[in-house]
Amino acid sequence: MVSIGSRVTIQEADFDPETYHLVGATEADPRNGRISHESPIGHALMDKKVGQIAEAETPGGKIKFKIISIE
């Protein structure tokens, strides 16, 4: 289950997988793969499990992605 401190690999349809480290707001550094649990993607990931689909409303529009792995 995704929580703060998890390293999560997600994949949107037709895109390569991306890995993010979910951190607290003060530790966020999106350019280095560290996203806040309060960000749209981070919030959508919280409490999800491998194989689940999550949706997030981002500045670029709504995205849907599958959780590939959680470490």
What are these regions (language model features)?
Residues M1-K66:
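Non-DNA-binding regulatory cores of transcription-related proteins
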Residues I67-E71:
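Short, compositionally biased
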